[in-house]
């Protein structure tokens, strides 16, 4: 069976994946970071979701080496009350 080409193939491809996915890259590798600091709360907040969970590497594009450091840094910052455990404390 011949491979589909032309406009039909392009339409079919767009229908399968309607959202454009940007190529993921590791922010820490690009910046040349050696160690992730637990005191840098602004950077750490970017990797915490709305519900307070740590965003996985498959969504952020962070390399495994830095994801482990990020996990430890967030947990340390939470323990020292630099970051909240949850996003909103509702009474």
Curated annotation (Swiss-Prot):
TM region positions: none
SUPFAM superfamilies: Ribosomal protein S18
Cellular component, GO, one term: cytosolic small ribosomal subunit
Chain segments annotated as coiled-coil in the UniProt record: none
Keyword RNA-binding included in the entry's annotation: yes
GO molecular function: small ribosomal subunit rRNA binding; structural constituent of ribosome
Pfam families: Ribosomal_S18 (PF01084)
GO biological process: translation
Keywords, sorted A to Z: Ribonucleoprotein, Ribosomal protein, RNA-binding, rRNA-binding
Family: Belongs to the bacterial ribosomal protein bS18 family.
HAMAP family: Ribosomal_bS18
Its biological purpose: Binds as a heterodimer with protein bS6 to the central domain of the 16S rRNA, where it helps stabilize the platform of the 30S subunit.
PANTHER family the UniProt entry points to: 30S RIBOSOMAL PROTEIN S18, SMALL RIBOSOMAL SUBUNIT PROTEIN BS18M
Subunit structure: Part of the 30S ribosomal subunit. Forms a tight heterodimer with protein bS6.
Annotated protein name in UniProt: Small ribosomal subunit protein bS18
Species of provenance: Burkholderia ambifaria (strain MC40-6)
Lineage: Bacteria, Pseudomonadati, Pseudomonadota, Betaproteobacteria, Burkholderiales
């Amino acid at each position: 069976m011949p491979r589909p080409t032309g406009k039909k193939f392009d339409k079919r491809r767009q229908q399968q994946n309607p959202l454009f996915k940007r190529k993921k890259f590791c922010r820490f590798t690009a910046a040349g970071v050696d160690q992730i600091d637990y005191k840098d709360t602004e950077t750490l907040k970017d990797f915490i979701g709305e519900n307070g969970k740590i965003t996985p590497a498959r969504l952020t594009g962070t390399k495994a080496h830095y994801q482990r450091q990020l996990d430890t840094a967030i947990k340390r910052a939470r323990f020292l009350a630099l970051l909240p455990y949850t996003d909103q404390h509702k009474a």
